[in-house]
Every structure is written in structure tokens, then in C-alpha cells.
């Protein structure tokens, strides 16, 4: 479906051409002076030099050719040569009627759908999710949803960290605590127990204990390193323990991610990439990409245009051990083999930028990806407390993600009960829905690359640019529609009529921008654009609501038009929040 601005640009381009100028000057954009006009064309300013003519004279010629246009209700030249435009109420109403019929509400579906793998989430197993895991999960989830909405095949991969020293630490600590377990008996040849010798809460206590010991006791650390090495060599007892650790951890991770309304298509792990490493390293050596430097195996990735030093990409340490770079490169090999993606996008902390520059350059230089495969990195900023430092508990520790969610839910529950609009038995469920919106919108409304302050009081407010405010707007629309139906109204009756007042036209204009906004949000990997858009739509609707007697409107055709407009507004808002990864309750 064409954008509203496409129709306008067609009119302007034809008017430029008819006046003897190049049609390419007919581009139209949203006005930066809404007090003067809704849209503007600056083509006359751009064309003045080429035609050696004053821009206001060019603009005058063009405006003269728009006299019979049905698209514009206002078209005027403003010196030094701007063309100010207002769309006609009739044309705008017709455009919204087309939007109503369109499954995608005016957003274009990709003409050439791409296969995109998004690497997000990325927690280490055997450790609880904490607030530092929040951003990758919810930004990646939103980008995945937006990509699918515009027609691409998007594959979400959690990419678990399961193959590093933390495994050796857990195995070593278990051996100290329960040396009698069969996993540590080298002579044991039977089947290993089906049930894990620990619960998730015990596992989450074992790791920090072992990590602390390894920092104080070098002999303990060496044992853990040896256990890691034996695991990676495939020692049966250790592999059985690793399977238990994975099973218990992944079950808990899935529960926590479900509470965030985040899901993954793949639960791939670092260990899945290990089989690809030997052949990959051998290829890089044979083709002369990899060489030894102080015992380590590296690949040069610096480029002449670099403005800062980019160190070589290290493949193997001097003891032959692999690193994160090795695993990430092998994972690219695996993804190319399994999915042949057009793009692989990593949603990770921006402090990992250098790592991914090295990995991407190494993958390209050594031919791990096709020339047209896009490798991209969305580095997000830090979630900080009100003090501007990384978000912590009141005691100064790292806050678990489930505790943050519980705190926000409790805050929302208190506010909803105070509001008394929902019965107590429903208030808990509503608080969870609204609490999740508060968290996700609070994060996603910020540009991903920037640090932001996680302000619980502001994020849980029903006023201002917040998730609860957006949901309150949707619930308000639902309530009006329910009352209309209860009074015998038919939601399918009538059609959207031309706007009868300024606030109604402003709402219609905001709705008409959905398609352009979605395409921009996907191209720029920018969920914050959806947040900014639905905040404007919500404000426009609430202004319209306060200025318009909707249900008490006596003219039946006008009332039906309002109801159709409300349904479209609800659909646009609900589609948008689904792309952000949350939903609206029926009451709040």
C-alpha cells in the first residue's frame, strides 16, 4: 500500500514536471512547523541553482499547477521558496479506509524477503539472569518481531555460554562437596543417573562460591581449568554432569524469558560450534591467513582506513585453547551451513564493539561468509540507576531479573488497587501485564545505543511517555467500544468520514504515518521509533477524546465514523505494542 506522502510526492512531481522542472524535486516530508502546515516540499529551494531562478518563482509555478489537486486542501508558496501543504480531509479519510482493509495497516511487505539470524539474550548457563541481561533480550525480541512483520524470515538464537571455565568451576566444587558421586569415579561404566544431583537454587549458589574460591586459591583454579579441559575432551562423567547443568539451567532460563514475553527459535550453545573449530582453524592456516605470534595463533584484521589500532584476531592461545573469538567465528560457520542467512545481527553490550569488529573482519577476510552476507552489531548502552551508575539492589549488589520484575509488578499492583478500577482478584494479573509494559517501554523508548536511567517511579506512572500510559489509552478505547456495543451499536456499520475538527484530523494524520514508521524502525533497527510514534498517537487520541462527544453524538453516521476511527486507532496501538513485546489488559 502506498504511503500518504507517496501520493503527495506524485502530485508534486507532476506539478514540477508540468512547470518545466525535473520531477525529482517533488519530494514531500512532514512539516517541522506544524503551526503553519502539515507537510512541506523544499524542492524549489534545491532546484534554484540548477535553473538559475529564484526559489519562490519556481515554487509559485509549481503551486499554480496544484490548483485542481484533490490531495491537498492547502498549497501555498512561502518565501524564500517553501511549498507548505495540508492534506484534504476527504483524501485523508479515504486513505484511512484503505488502511482499514490492509492487513499490515499500510506497511509494505519486503519485496525480497531476507533470512536474518539475530543473536540476542546470550546468558551463561548456571547463573541467574540479572538486570544486565534485560536489554539484549527485549531489544532483540522487538527487532525480531518487527522484521517478521515486514516479511522477512527472522531466526532468534539465544546463543548460550556453556563451554567456558564456569563449567569447570561447578564440576570442581561438586567434586569437593560430593566426591562419592559416580560422575567422579573413573572406573564407573554404567549409565549415569537421569536426575541431576542439584536443583537450580543449589546450582546458583555453587557457581559464585566456586568462583570466589578460584580467585583466592590458585590450586583450586588449576583444578577447575583441568576439569574444563577434561569436559571439552569429552570425559564421560563430566559430560553427564554438563548435561544435568544444561537441563536444569535451560528450564529455569525458559521460565524467566517467558515472564519477559521473550522467546527464541534456537537454543544453540557455544558447545554446538566446537566441532567446526578444527577444520576452520586448519583452513585459515593452510590459506595463510593465520600465523603464530608469541605462541598464539592470530589473523591480522587491521585496515588502512583505521583511525584507531585494531589488534589481530586471536584464534588459539599459546596452550592451544580456543577463545570467545574462536567460538563466535565457528558459530558463523555453523549458521552459514544451516541457514545461509543474508544477515547475522548481534544485539550485545556496546563495550563488545572491538571484539565484533575483529570477528566480522576475520570472517570476511577468510571467506567464512559470502560477499553479500551482512554482519551487523547493535551495541546497546547501560541500564543505570538514578545515581547514573549501573543499576544495583539497595544493598549495592547485582539485581536478579526476576526480582526486578517482581518489584515492578508490586508497584503496579499498589497503583491499580488504589485506582479501584479492577477487582482485587484480577488486579494481580493486570499488574503483571502493566508491569511488563512499564519495564519494556521504559527500556525500548530510549535509543538502544545510549545509556539510560531506569526510574521505577517514572516508568510505572500512568502519565507521560510510559508503558502504563499507552496501555491506559488502549483500555480507554476498549471501554468506549464495549459501551457502544452494549448500547446496541454495530462495530461494522458506517465508514470513516472526513475529520470534523482539528483534533480528529490530527489523530487521522498520526495514524496515517504507521507504515512509514514501521519501515524506518526496521531499517534502522530502532524500536524506540515505535515508542515515539505510539506516544504521539496516544496523545492525539486523548486530545480527540476530551474534545469530542463520541457516544453522545446525535448524528448516527458521524457516531459510526468515530467508532470506526477508534477501532483503527486500537488496532494500530495493539499492533505496535505487540512489536515491542507486550500486550494490553481489558481493564486497569
List where the protein language model places each region.
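Non-catalytic interaction-recognition regions
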Residues: 1-93, 107-588
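Short, charged, solvent-exposed linker or helix-capping segments at domain edges/interfaces
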Residues: 94-99
Amino acid at each position: 500500500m502506498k504511503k500518504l506522502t507517496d501520493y503527495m510526492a506524485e502530485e508534486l512531481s507532476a506539478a514540477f514536471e508540468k512547470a518545466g522542472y525535473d520531477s525529482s524535486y517533488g519530494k514531500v516530508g512532514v512539516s517541522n512547523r506544524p503551526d503553519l502546515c502539515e507537510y512541506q516540499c523544499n524542492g524549489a529551494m534545491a532546484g534554484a541553482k540548477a535553473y538559475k531562478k529564484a526559489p519562490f518563482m519556481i515554487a509559485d509555478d509549481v503551486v499554480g499547477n496544484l490548483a485542481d489537486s484533490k490531495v491537498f486542501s492547502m498549497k501555498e508558496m512561502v518565501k524564500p521558496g517553501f511549498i507548505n501543504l495540508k492534506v484534504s480531509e476527504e483524501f485523508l479519510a479515504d486513505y484511512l479506509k484503505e488502511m482499514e482493509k490492509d492487513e499490515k495497516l499500510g506497511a509494505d511487505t519486503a519485496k525480497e524477503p531476507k533470512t536474518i539470524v539475530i543473536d540476542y539474550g546470550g546468558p551463561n548457563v548456571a547463573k541467574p539472569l540479572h538486570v544486565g541481561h534485560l536489554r539484549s533480550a527485549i531489544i532483540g525480541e522487538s527487532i525480531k518481531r518487527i522484521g517478521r512483520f515486514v516479511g522477512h524470515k527472522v531466526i532468534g538464537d539465544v546463543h548460550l555460554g556453556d563451554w567456558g571455565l564456569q563449567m569447570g568451576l561447578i564440576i570442581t566444587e561438586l567434586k569437593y562437596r560430593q566426591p562419592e558421586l559416580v560422575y567422579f569415579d573413573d572406573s564407573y561404566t554404567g549409565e549415569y543417573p537421569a536426575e541431576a544431583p542439584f536443583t537450580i537454587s543449589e546450582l546458583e549458589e555453587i557457581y559464585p562460591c566456586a568462583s570466589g574460591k578460584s580467585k583466592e586459591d590458585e590450586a583450586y583454579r588449576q583444578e577447575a581449568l583441568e576439569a574444563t579441559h577434561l569436559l571439552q575432551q569429552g570425559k564421560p562423567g563430566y559430560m553427564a554432569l554438563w548435561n544435568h547443568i544444561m537441563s536444569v539451567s535451560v528450564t529455569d532460563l525458559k521460565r524467566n524469558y517467558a515472564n519477559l514475553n521473550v522467546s527464541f527459535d534456537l537454543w544453540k550453545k557455544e558447545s554446538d560450534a566446537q566441532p567446526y573449530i578444527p577444520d576452520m582453524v586448519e583452513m585459515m592456516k593452510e590459506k595463510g591467513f593465520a600465523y603464530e605470534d608469541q605462541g598464539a595463533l592470530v589473523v591480522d584484521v587491521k585496515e588502512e582506513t583505521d583511525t584507531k589500532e585494531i589488534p589481530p584476531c586471536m584464534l588459539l592461545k599459546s596452550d592451544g585453547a580456543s577463545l570467545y573469538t574462536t567460538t563466535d567465528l565457528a558459530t558463523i560457520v555453523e549458521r552459514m551451513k544451516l541457514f545461509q542467512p543474508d544477515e547475522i545481527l548481534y544485539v550485545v553490550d556496546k563495550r563488545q564493539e572491538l571484539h565484533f569488529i575483529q570477528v566480522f573482519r576475520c570472517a570476511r577476510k577468510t571467506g567464512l561468509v559470502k560477499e553479500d552476507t551482512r554482519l551487523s552489531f547493535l551495541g546497546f548502552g547501560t541500564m543505570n540507576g538514578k545515581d547514573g551508575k549501573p543499576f544495583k539492589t539497595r544493598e549495592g549488589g547485582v539485581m536478579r531479573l526476576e526480582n526486578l520484575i517482581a518489584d515492578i509488578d508490586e508497584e503496579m499492583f499498589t497503583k491499580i488497587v488504589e485506582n479501584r478500577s479492577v477487582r482485587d482478584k484480577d488486579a494481580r494479573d493486570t499488574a503483571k501485564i502493566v508491569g511488563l509494559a512499564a519495564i519494556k517501554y521504559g527500556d525500548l523508548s530510549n535509543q538502544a545505543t545510549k545509556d539510560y536511567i531506569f526510574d521505577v517511579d517514572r516508568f510505572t506512572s500512568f502519565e507521560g511517555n510510559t508503558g502504563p500510559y499507552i496501555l491506559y489509552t488502549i483500555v480507554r478505547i476498549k471501554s468506549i467500544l464495549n459501551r457502544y456495543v452494549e448500547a446496541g451499536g454495530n462495530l461494522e456499520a458506517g465508514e470513516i468520514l472526513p475529520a470534523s475538527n482539528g483534533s480528529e484530523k490530527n489523530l487521522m494524520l498520526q495514524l496515517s504515518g504507521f507504515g512509514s514508521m514501521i519501515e524506518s524502525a526496521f531499517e534502522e533497527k530502532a524500536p524506540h521509533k515505535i515508542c515515539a510514534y505510539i506516544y504521539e498517537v496516544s496523545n492525539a487520541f486523548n486530545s480527540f477524546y476530551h474534545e469530542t462527544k463520541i457516544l453522545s453524538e446525535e448524528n448516527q453516521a458521524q457516531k459510526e465514523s468515530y467508532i470506526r476511527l477508534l477501532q483503527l486507532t486500537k488496532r494500530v496501538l495493539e499492533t505496535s505494542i505487540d512489536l515491542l513485546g507486550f500486550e494490553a489488559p481489558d481493564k486497569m
